[in-house]
């Protein structure tokens, strides 16, 4: 984690830089840009910090402009050389007095003229965009919301190989809402919160992991917990049902059997009495 750097010494260096006629960006001033590119926090007054950014952007855009002009000149020179060679070969070749000029020569001349016009239009347009951007930047009252990205573009400008692409990239940074810079007291508080926040997040993550491990319930356990305990119903003294129990059924069956046996005994005794009476009568 990168903390916000603030010191009165750097602030004085910024103030002195603003007063210089021939400005020189020291390593200490470059460290301010590098710190903002990592934290996104501006803790120095924008009116002095803006001078540093303006100088660096103007310097970088000048580099791109010179490279663009040099590249355009090289392209034009190459085209001119090709045209000259074609013209010389056409002149050296035997031609009749009535033969017209070579069509290829006409095409090369037109291409050269179009390339010159294109380069002039592009260069004038880019220079105009550059001037408008720098003027708007110098008039800004607050740091852009994307100041972190702006610092990254200042530090890593060599990643861009095109003048137009870099100019469009920095121009977008200025068209975003602005925010006030932090005071020195707010910087101290911000750094404290960053440190305590990292410790709090690590402890919270550990607690959350432990709680999750403890309270995790498998689908089988959850299903068993949702089902009622059948034993508490089957063996509860207060449990009732509309169906007779097995004990009641067996008791009723036993009583019926005893009654039938008694009835059979009575009938047997009656039969024995009748037989005895018949035997006496025969004698």
Swiss-Prot record:
Belongs to the PPP4R2 family. Serine/threonine-protein phosphatase 4 (PP4) occurs in different assemblies of the catalytic and one or more regulatory subunits. Probably part of a PP4 complex containing ppp4c and ppp4r2. This is Serine/threonine-protein phosphatase 4 regulatory subunit 2. Residues 75-105, 192-283 are annotated as: Disordered. Transmembrane segments: none annotated. Signal peptide: none annotated. Residues 192-203, 221-230 have a biased composition (Polar residues). Pfam families: PPP4R2. InterPro entries: PPP4R2. Residues 75-104, 204-220, 232-257 have a biased composition (Low complexity). Residues 259-273 have a biased composition (Basic and acidic residues). Probable regulatory subunit of serine/threonine-protein phosphatase 4 (PP4). One of its GO terms (cellular component) is nucleus. One of its GO terms (molecular function) is protein phosphatase regulator activity.
